[in-house]
């Protein structure tokens, strides 16, 4: 049986210095809000609400579906058109959770999508420090559990 090489998911994606960050969570978790704060701090929008993921070798590449390119929801303001990147290689998956679900000192976690393992963090999307935490996580590297490796078959 052949494994899929592409999927579309409900998420948001931004890139810091070209490194893609996939923001996941239920509606209202703060995906678009956090993306706007990251863009305001210098990140680039890749996709909001729906993200196309494509496996390219041992990497996952994120992009926006054509009708949504450059669009982001600013709750209370409306749909905004912003500059965007056509695509970004994913380096980090972030699950946005309730504040009481965020561990103070989490161990390494990974998420496998389309057979590619990526480091995963759980953050509260509305914390003021969330953009800084993500920038620092990329800069200093987030570990993938040793058993996961970069590519999961």
Give residue ranges: language-model regions:
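Glycine-rich phosphate-binding P-loop
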Residues: 14-39
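A short, compositionally biased
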Residues: 8-10, 47-48, 105
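Conserved nucleotide-sensing/catalytic segment adjacent to the nucleotide-binding pocket
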Residues: 40-98
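N-terminal pre-Walker A segment at the start of P-loop NTPase domains
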Residues: 1-8
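Short beta-strand scaffold segments in enzyme catalytic cores
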Residues: 12-14, 52
């Amino acid at each position: 049986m052949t494994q899929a090489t592409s999927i579309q998911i409900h998420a948001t994606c931004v890139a810091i210095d070209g490194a893609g960050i996939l923001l996941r969570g239920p509606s209202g978790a703060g995906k678009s809000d956090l993306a706007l704060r990251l863009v305001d701090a210098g990140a680039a929008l890749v996709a909001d609400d729906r993200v196309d993921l494509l496996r390219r070798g041992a990497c996952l590449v994120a992009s926006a579906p054509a009708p949504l390119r450059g669009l982001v929801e600013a709750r209370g303001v409306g749909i905004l058109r912003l500059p965007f990147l056509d695509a970004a290689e994913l380096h980090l998956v972030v699950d946005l959770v309730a504040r009481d679900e965020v561990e103070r000192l989490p161990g390494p976690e990974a998420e496998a999508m389309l057979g590619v393992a990526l480091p995963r963090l759980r953050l509260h999307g509305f914390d003021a420090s969330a953009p800084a935490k993500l920038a620092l996580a990329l800069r200093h590297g987030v570990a993938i559990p040793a058993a996961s490796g970069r590519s999961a078959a």
